[in-house]
Design a protein with these regions (language model features):
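An interfacial alpha-helical scaffold signature
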Residues: 1-137
C-alpha cells in the first residue's frame, strides 16, 4: 500500500468508527492506524480554538487540509507534513492542550470530522492495545 492509500484507508476507518464507535474490529483498526499511519499535521505544534478548547488539527486527507487552510489564515502560515499521530498527541499533552481535532472544516462532508480529548484518546488507545496484546498472548 502506498502512503496515499494508507492515509485513505485511515480516513475510511475513521468514518466507519464515527458511524459505529462501539464496533470492536473498527476500534482495533482505528488504533492500528493511530499507531502506524501518519496524519497530515503542522510541522511545529499548532493549535486552534474549537468550542473554547485549544486543539491540534490533523487531517486524514489532503482535500480537508486544503479546505481548512482556505478558511483559517493561520493554517496557511504552517508547514504541513506527514507526522505520527502519537507524536502529535505526545506534544499536545506536554503543552497541556485539550486534544486532537481530525479533519476540521467549515462545510462539506463532516463524516470524518471529530474531536478527541487527549485523555480519552490515550485511554482508548491503551485499552485496545492491551486487549490485542492479551489476545495475542
Amino acid at each position: 500500500m502506498t502512503e496515499n492509500q494508507e492515509l485513505q484507508a485511515f480516513d475510511e476507518t475513521l468514518k466507519e468508527f464515527l458511524k459505529e464507535p462501539d464496533h470492536f474490529l473498527t476500534s482495533l483498526a482505528l488504533v492500528n492506524h493511530l499507531q502506524r499511519t501518519p496524519v497530515l499535521a503542522a510541522q511545529d505544534l499548532y493549535a486552534v480554538e474549537v468550542e473554547g478548547k485549544k486543539v491540534v488539527p490533523v487531517f486524514t486527507n489532503e482535500q480537508d487540509l486544503q479546505s481548512f487552510k482556505a478558511t483559517q489564515e493561520s493554517a496557511r502560515e504552517q508547514i504541513w507534513i506527514e507526522r505520527s499521530s502519537l507524536d502529535v498527541l505526545t506534544q499536545l499533552v506536554q503543552a497541556e492542550l485539550f486534544g486532537l481535532a481530525f479533519n476540521l472544516k467549515e462545510d462539506g462532508d463532516f463524516s470524518n470530522t471529530t474531536l478527541f480529548a487527549s485523555s480519552e484518546l490515550i485511554q482508548f488507545i491503551n485499552y485496545f492495545t492491551q486487549t490485542l496484546n492479551n489476545l495475542l498472548g
